[in-house]
Amino acid sequence: MSANAAAKKQKPLKRHPSKLKRMSAYMILTLILISIVAVLFAFPLYWIITGSFKTGAAINATTPEWWPSQWVLTNYQKLFSGKSAPLWQLAVPFGSKFSANGEPIYFSVGPTAPAAIRWMINTVFMAVMSMILTCITAAMAGYALAKKRFVGRKLLFTLIVCAMALPKQVILIPLLREMSSLNLYNTIWAVIFPIVGWPFGVFLMKQFSEGIPTELLEAARIDGASEAKTFIDIVLPMVKPGIGALAIFTFINSWNDYFMQLIMLSSTSNLTISLGIAKLQAENSTDFGLIMAGAALAAVPIIIIFLIFQKYFTKGIAMGAVKG
């Protein structure tokens, strides 16, 4: 009797199949919503790429072709058969100070090439130089703000954080006057130098530098290491993930900074690929195939670079957030 009574008192385990079903339905709904958003974001890129391989009749047809019935390279042939110019023409930084008429000093490299190739070279040079110089200056400034003690350090960091909130339109006129006074206006350097002082880069590298053990720095000083050797041999290896994330971020930001390029550059020889596409659109407002070919040339490389280094970018940003 006691065994039967104990069996009656024992309650069966409760199961929640409905909860599992609700969780499964929630996950399915989430995946559906994410897929819809992904399609909405990816469709314009798909339309540009496929449209660049369509004929003019197919692009202007009343019934759109979701997949080209005939693949042609006519639009890219027109894009790369435009006006010829030296393959690359670069202004010497501050070279106007040494010229007789005060104009920038240029040097040309390579044979003549279509304007689109030159625009692409200008864009790559601008993005790479911005990335290198920003990483160098931000790493040094972030390390100094994190590990050096000097008067006004907190105030300086507060000003940097406040500068991050300022839109580019607010500082546009001072930047324009500064570049003009340095005779850098209408040169590629007028776009590069403002990016080098990017406040976000300093903020990010300071967060990474905060995680460097002070004991390592003190041990290096005791061993007689100079400040430069300590920075190169100890600091840089420990903030490498942050430098990688900042490099990708700066490269993409510089490549896509259409507004600053539009204000600082005017001559055809100094245009970037984004400005070149806008110029093509102004001159060929009805040639949508040519415009799509230029847009694809500008968008596809940066998307590929981001997809390749996306893992390192997100990892670096996450590590910086944790250390900060």
Predicted features, each with a name:
Residues M1-K21:
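Short, Lys/Arg-rich, polar N-terminal cytosolic tail immediately upstream
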